[in-house]
């Protein structure tokens, strides 16, 4: 497999390097996930909102069957789209487990803070109790959203907060808060959807290490300790994105990359929502 693991606050080891399936064309999702698994990816990230849980699951099952890989050796993440309360969320958990066909989901996240997050969280806790979910967390939550959840005295503390993270978007207040609570950060859109390719400083650092801009941004997130979820539907780039474990960015260059921060969000940013 590619990369190492991060230990979550519930004791589980989660592969740090993941394949992100957001915005992967549905006609290409199965093949792209299968290609990622062939390249050594062992963490696949999906969501109800992506409408590809079934395609991801089929690719994982095919890979398991053809290689003899055990279910416990592949980590599957998905996310709840509609936070409509306890009963609705219980049904949504069942729907996701059925859709992926994997028997259980390793990590299930509240996709955003919008909706009834407290009651929906209680349903996720029930999913863990019933063995349908192994770990639970949140996505796009700001410190105030998480604190509200913690103030409700949950049985389970969120394991992960998945937010947009890359050199141009440090979200340091969110990172600092989560780290103070033992919540693992996961970086989506680590490549900024390509919107910052061509940046002179990024290009200079990429040239120095004889790596692509994408590889530098992925490596940056890994060295920050984040779970990282690069996305591509091109087999060559899927492989290239994983070729980031044969070098290390120096402390000086990590600081240069960090200083590129301009609070640039390539996607939505519910972290700042007052609701």
Curated annotation (Swiss-Prot):
Its Enzyme Commission number(s) read 1.-.-.-
SUPFAM superfamilies this protein is in?
Answer: NAD(P)-linked oxidoreductase
Q: Where does NADPH bind?
A: 45, 139, 162, 191, 196, 232-233, 237
Q: Which InterPro entries match?
A: AKR, Aldo/ket_reductase_CS, NADP_OxRdtase_dom, NADP_OxRdtase_dom_sf
Domain of life (superkingdom): Eukaryota
* Keywords, in A-Z order: Cytoplasm, NADP, Nucleus, Oxidoreductase
Subcellular location per UniProt equals: Cytoplasm; Nucleus
* Cystine connections: none
Any one Gene Ontology MF annotation carried by this entry is: L-arabinose reductase (NADPH) activity
- What are the residue positions of the site described as Lowers pKa of active site Tyr? 79
Q: What's its top-level EC category? A: oxidoreductase
Query: Where does it primarily localize?
Result: cytoplasm
Is Signal among the key words of this record?
Answer: no
Q: Name one GO cellular component term.
A: nucleus
Q: Does the keyword rRNA-binding apply?
A: no
Q: Where is the catalytic site? A: 50, 111
Q: Which GO terms describe its biological process?
A: arabinose catabolic process; D-xylose catabolic process
Concerning its family, UniProt says:
Belongs to the aldo/keto reductase family.
Protein name, as recorded: Uncharacterized oxidoreductase C2F3.05c
Q: What is the scientific name of the source organism?
A: Schizosaccharomyces pombe (strain 972 / ATCC 24843)
């Amino acid at each position: 497999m590619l990369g190492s693991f991060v230990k979550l606050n519930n004791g589980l080891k989660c592969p740090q390097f993941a394949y992100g399936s957001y915005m992967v064309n549905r006609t290409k999702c199965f093949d792209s996930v299968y290609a990622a698994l062939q390249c050594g990816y062992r963490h696949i990230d999906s969501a109800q909102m992506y409408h590809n849980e079934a395609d991801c699951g089929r690719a994982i099952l095919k890979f398991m069957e053809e290689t003899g890989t055990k279910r416990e050796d592949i980590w599957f993440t998905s996310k709840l789209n509609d936070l409509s309360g306890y009963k609705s969320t219980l049904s949504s958990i069942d729907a996701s487990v059925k859709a992926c066909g994997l028997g259980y989901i390793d990590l299930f996240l509240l996709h955003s803070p919008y909706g009834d997050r407290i009651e929906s969280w209680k349903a996720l806790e029930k999913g863990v109790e019933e063995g349908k979910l192994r770990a639970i967390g949140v996505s796009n939550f700001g410190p105030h959203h998480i604190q509200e959840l913690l103030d409700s005295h949950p049985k389970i503390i969120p394991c992960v907060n998945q937010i947009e993270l890359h050199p141009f978007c440090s979200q340091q207040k969110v990172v600092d808060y989560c780290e103070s609570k033992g919540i693992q950060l996961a970086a989506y859109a680590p490549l900024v959807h390509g919107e910052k390719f061509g940046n002179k400083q990024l290009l200079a650092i990429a040239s120095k290490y004889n790596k692509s801009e994408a590889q530098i941004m992925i490596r940056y997130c890994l060295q920050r300790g984040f779970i990282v979820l690069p996305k591509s539907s091109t087999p060559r780039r899927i492989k290239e994105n994983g070729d980031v474990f044969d070098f290390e960015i120096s402390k000086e260059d990590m600081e240069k990359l960090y200083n590129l921060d301009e609070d640039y969000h390539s996607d939505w940013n519910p972290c700042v929502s007052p609701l």
